[in-house]
């Protein structure tokens, strides 16, 4: 299993920046490339190429942070801001288009709500995961089921 060309979707979280570092280290060792994408999910009520100014600015800032993270390990990434109807489909489509060997997804650790916080789940809602459990969500689920390549998922350690 050699990752040469790697796709890393970023959202600005510390976890996604760690995924960029891991991808750069791996691709550098294998003389490959890293493609970093920030996907703006465009509501169906707007045209796909709608000008989403504030979100585009946020995406460009996050891509810039990813490029800086790559420079820390003496590597260059190719960053791209994408607009799509669905983030998960955009990630898989980008992996196909760029013919990558792997996708590295990052998930942040989210602590379940403590008992006695007064929080009540809405009717039909689900309780918080037990300690050590978490739910990846629809984007991760779709990418895991449909990616044409290997998918790595990283999670940062719990912070007390």
Range-by-range predicted roles:
Residues 1-53, 69-78:
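Small/aliphatic-rich secondary-structure junction motif
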Residues 11, 50-58, 128-135:
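Alpha-helix N-cap and loop-to-helix initiation/capping positions
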Residues 19, 46-50, 89-92, 115-117:
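Short, well-ordered secondary-structure micro-motifs
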Residues 22, 55-66, 90:
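Short, solvent-exposed amphipathic alpha-helices that sit
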Residues 39-41, 84, 156:
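Active-site loop/turn elements of alpha/beta-hydrolase fold enzymes
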Residues 82-90:
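Charged docking surfaces used in two-component/phosphorelay signaling
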Residues 97-160:
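Gly/Ser-rich helix-loop-strand patches that form or flank binding pockets
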């Amino acid at each position: 299993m050699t990752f040469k060309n790697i796709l890393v979707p970023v959202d600005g979280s510390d976890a996604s920046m760690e995924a960029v570092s891991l991808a750069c280290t791996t691709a550098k060792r294998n003389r490959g490339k890293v493609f970093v994408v920030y996907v703006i999910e465009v509501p169906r009520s707007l045209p796909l190429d709608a000008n989403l100014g504030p979100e585009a600015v946020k995406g460009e800032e996050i891509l810039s942070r990813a490029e800086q993270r790559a420079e820390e390990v003496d590597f260059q990434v190719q960053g791209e801001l994408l607009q799509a109807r669905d983030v998960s489909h955009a990630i898989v489509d980008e992996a196909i288009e760029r013919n990558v060997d792997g996708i590295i997804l990052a998930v942040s650790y989210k602590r379940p709500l403590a008992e006695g916080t007064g929080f009540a789940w809405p009717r039909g809602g689900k309780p918080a995961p037990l300690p050590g459990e978490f739910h990846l969500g629809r984007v991760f689920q779709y990418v895991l089921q449909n990616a044409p390549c290997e998918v790595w998922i990283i999670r940062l350690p719990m912070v007390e």
